[in-house]
Amino acid sequence: MAEVGLSQNSYASANHDKKSEQQIRRRVAEFHPNVWEYEFLQSLSSPYGAPSYCERINILIEEIKMDIFDGLVGDGEKNMNPSAYDLLERFFVVDILQSLGIERHFKKEIKAVLDYTYKYWNDEKGISLASGNLIVDLNTNALGFKVLRLNEYYVSPDVFQNFQDEMGQFIDLENFKEDESKLRSLLSLYRASEICFPEENILKQAKMFASTCLRQAIEENRELVNKSQLIIEVEYIMKYPWTCRVPRWEVWNYIKIFRGDTDASMCMKGVYEMPSDKRTKILELAILDFNILQDQHHNELKILSKWWNETKVKELNFFRQRHVEFYFLYACGLYEKELSATRLCFAKVGALITLLDDIFDTYGTIDELVPFATALIKWDMSIMNHLPEYMKTCFQFAYKTYMEIATEAEKIHGPCVQKWMHDTWKTIILAQLQDAEWIANNYLPSLTEYLESSVPSTTVPVLSLFSMLLIDTIFPDDIIEKITKFQSCVAWGCRLVDDSKDFQDEKEHGESASWIECYMKENPGTTRKQALDHANMLIESNFEELIKHRIFYEYCIPSTCKRLYFDMYRSVAFIFKDIDGFSKSSKAIRDDIKKILVEPIYF
């Protein structure tokens, strides 16, 4: 890497003055412009900010506590006549509330319910349908495993060995496509298998078995006009793996499924059926909660678009202007009203880092980039004197954005944030400069070289740390050391997801270094398909590590920080699911953004 010295004025001047701006041949990736017009975002309006809707939510919360939880919270001493499925009922209620995104209103009640059910969980025998009988079925155990594990209770997947026969099947498959109870059990098994830690082979076997059966059921019902809600739910779960089922997207889809569930398939027809009046209250709360949060997002999008409209960099046409897409990525995971500052921070830093990424990867020349990197690291405006105007504009934008965030972060967490931010900032600038030098020299690095530079250049460390510092919660003094392992796992996963989707586009833009290309270089004779298959295997194993970090991380860090990292990865997996939906904001991605951020759900 070219040395980033104390001063690059003469270096920049000597090289840049040799050619006028018109003579410099710049690479341009021809990204499409920002698709979210200022006027459109400023026009967003919603009635759900009115106090009456918040009052209605509070009423519904109290009614649900009385109507549903009063019968579920407590043990046998308070409930002398438990139903024939009281444990399954508890798991079902918690699962529905979490799928609909309203569980935060019932934290105390949910903990009491799960503490009760956990007393009956046995890692060898599993759990029965009810506290008063010994009937053990696959659906209850699969749903219970998923709910308990996601809520940080230790449960072993060994219970599923009780349901696996010598042929590897977990259920009698006779007429399973027409038998809703069997199909529901298969769906619960699949959803449980998605919450897999490394080396849990029984869950991998369960996933393979359940996914094969569920895909057969989908194919069998493909031509039906009036599909059951259970089949619609199966189609959704199989189309969007848990890897990319970000919370707000999950909520939107489950509201649709729950609302259309007139045949009570979600309520496990024939086993447990929730009374319609209780279902109606839960659905009303979920829709109101979604719309009220969306009203908050409308207000934030107005702030964000106003901020962007007042910048000078918006006039530059060589980079991806994706501030709304960044906001969407973050809001899908951390959506609560009190996290407004961190959402806006993520979108602003994302817009800044994308600008710098496109300068270093595509638009800038190496003669410009070396002094530019020094200026960014040292915040030295004097270095910019002999650099082109577009870089001066970008430097001023970077400096202002960085300092605004640093000022706000210091108010919350003290002066220690200055070093944290600068160390992370320096790392990404140097990593991007390294990438630029490889491009300039047409150099394809070794896999080791690539990983040392490309993981920091994913932008994960900067985006996550800067946003985290605007979360108003108490951090341990050694928070940076504690998040390192989690952060590295997310960065590595995002790098693989990114490279596996857009390596061909980047190669056409002159960016030959991607994990795919480096792996093929290091393994002569490997085809691109083989390299992609290997990348997908690494993505899957890395996600298993992420799941374990999310649920049982070895260090004590605030739960909001764990959510930030975990859902940041899932948001990237979501937007890169089929294509690089970030660089190419397709109609499908725009429609998804509208569903979550723009269009209310009507009753």
UniProtKB/Swiss-Prot annotation:
A GO BP entry: cadinene biosynthetic process
SUPFAM superfamilies: Terpenoid cyclases/Protein prenyltransferases, Terpenoid synthases
Reaction it catalyzes: (2E,6E)-farnesyl diphosphate = beta-cadinene + diphosphate
Named cofactor requirement(s): Mg(2+); Mn(2+)
Residues reported in the UniProt entry to bind Mg(2+) 2: 357, 361
Enzyme Commission number(s): 4.2.3.-
Cofactor note: Binds 3 Mg(2+) or Mn(2+) ions per subunit.
Pathway info: Secondary metabolite biosynthesis; terpenoid biosynthesis
Motif (DDXXD motif): 357-361
Residues the entry annotates as binding Mg(2+) 3: 498, 506
One protein family per Pfam: Terpene_synth_C
Domain notes: The Asp-Asp-Xaa-Xaa-Asp/Glu (DDXXD/E) motif is important for the catalytic activity, presumably through binding to Mg(2+).
UniProt similarity note: Belongs to the terpene synthase family. Tpsa subfamily.
Protein name per Swiss-Prot or TrEMBL: Sesquiterpene synthase Cad
Phylogenetic placement of the source organism: Eukaryota, Viridiplantae, Streptophyta, Embryophyta, Tracheophyta
